[in-house]
């Protein structure tokens, strides 16, 4: 599975992919945070296997927490659900606040990983996880979890690659 964040003609940094790069990519795609520019370029999702990883506290807001990145807006719930319905995207969870879960207590981890609606797939913020985090993800009912830093291919240690 490939990981993407933003779709833009202007490639500000590695968190941005051009529409042409997305069109030419092979395999399943995943979008972290579901930026509004994904919604604006939604035609690129047609016929693709796409997972949208949502961060609850940031839905409809900006990425102001993401120091060093250009300020961008995330989709709101209506836009996210429209993408799910029109393009048959899978809805995944990326925590409420996007904090490093490995630094939190067990109770805090559980609060972060339990989504507002049932979802089957989770993406670890910053790709970081440990046994406490994996256990919380299992308790929350997820069937799979993805990282961008490491993984052994098992259900809760699947690896995504940057496009």
Please annotate each region the language model reported.
Residues 43-48, 73-92, 138:
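Acidic (Asp/Glu)-rich catalytic clusters
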Residues 39-57:
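A short alpha/beta connector and helix-capping loop motif
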Residues 36, 57-60, 97-99, 129:
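Short, catalytically relevant binding-site loops at active-site mouths
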Residues 5, 94, 98:
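Histidine-centered divalent metal-coordination motifs
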Residues 51-53, 92, 123, 145-146:
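Structural detector of well-ordered beta-strand residues that form the stable sheet scaffold
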Residues 1-30, 35-42, 86, 103-163:
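C-terminal active-site subregion of NodB/CE4 polysaccharide deacetylases
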Residues 60-75:
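Aromatic- and acidic-residue-enriched segments that line the glycan-binding/catalytic groove
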Residues 65-66, 101-103:
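Surface-exposed, active-site-proximal loop segments in enzymatic domains
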């Amino acid at each position: 599975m490939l990981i993407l964040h933003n779709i833009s003609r202007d490639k500000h940094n590695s968190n941005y992919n051009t529409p042409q790069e997305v069109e030419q990519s092979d395999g399943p795609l995943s979008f972290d945070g579901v930026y509004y520019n994904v919604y604006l370029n939604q035609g690129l999702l047609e016929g693709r296997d796409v997972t949208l990883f949502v961060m609850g506290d940031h839905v409809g807001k900006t990425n102001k927490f993401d120091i060093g990145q250009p300020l961008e807006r995330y989709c709101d719930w209506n836009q996210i659900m429209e993408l799910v319905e029109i393009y048959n995207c899978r809805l995944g969870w990326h925590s409420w606040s996007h904090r490093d879960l490995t630094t939190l207590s067990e109770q805090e981890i559980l609060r972060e990983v339990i989504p507002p609606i049932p979802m089957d797939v989770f993406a670890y913020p910053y790709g970081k996880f440990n046994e406490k985090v994996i256990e919380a993800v299992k308790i929350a009912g997820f069937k799979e979890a993805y990282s961008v830093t490491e993984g052994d291919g098992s259900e809760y240690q699947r690896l995504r690659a940057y496009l």
